[in-house]
Amino acid sequence: MKILVTGGLGFIGSHTVVELQNEGFEVIAIDNLSNSSLEVLDGIERITGKKPIFENIDLREKAAVQSFFKKYSDISGVIHFAASKAVGESVENPLLYYENNINALVYVLQEITKLEKANFIFSSSCTVYGQAEVMPITENASVQPAMSPYGNTKQIGEEIITDVAKVTNMNSILLRYFNPIGAHESAEIGELPLGVPQNLVP
């Protein structure tokens, strides 16, 4: 089974690629390398014994996304991590976040819904809960107004996916996790951004 992991050389994406390959899936990783490095591919290979197929694609380029899905029309599922992710940066540069986190998502959804098997996992965020009314937060907690443009892009993304799933053959799930941190136990992959690390233990 062939699985596409967008943002596949990022922090969460690279760990997911490792787990998928260890389970026997054929993995294609897409990344535009805006906040990651090709060195991650070597780390994945040292852990699993195999490099994933890698495509250097910016998902904001619609034609590139269309070309990719024509090339790999036998994909069984997509795990979508590709996104800008820093809350503070999103406040300073909201248009970058709306372009990268929303446009790219729409372009991927437009193509995956054309496939025979449309399975989609979305990397959302605990930020969709906003200023939570009840603690601790559970999966049943209500979504509150976003506290940042980043959080808003995740809320909008969830709404888009929900709407698309209602009228297509796409199966989808939304992952709202809290502050994933730390390196792989092998220390071969971890938080290796080009800028300031966001996923380190204080």
Segments from the language model and where they lie:
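A short helix-coil junction within the Rossmann-fold of NAD(P)-dependent oxidoreductases
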Residues: K85-E89, E111-N119
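Short beta->alpha connector loops of Rossmann-like oxidoreductase domains
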Residues: S37, K85-V87, Y129-G130
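Rossmann-fold NAD(P)-dependent oxidoreductase module
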Residues: H15, E19, E111, I160
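Conserved NAD(P)H cofactor-binding loop of Rossmann-fold oxidoreductase domains
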Residues: A82-K85, S124-S125
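N-terminal Rossmann-like NAD(P) cofactor-binding module of classical short-chain dehydrogenase/reductase
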Residues: S76-I79, I121
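N-terminal Rossmann/SDR dinucleotide-binding element
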Residues: M1-G77
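Catalytic helix-loop patch of NAD(P)-dependent Rossmann-fold dehydrogenases
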Residues: E92-Y107, N119, V128-L174, N179-I181, ...
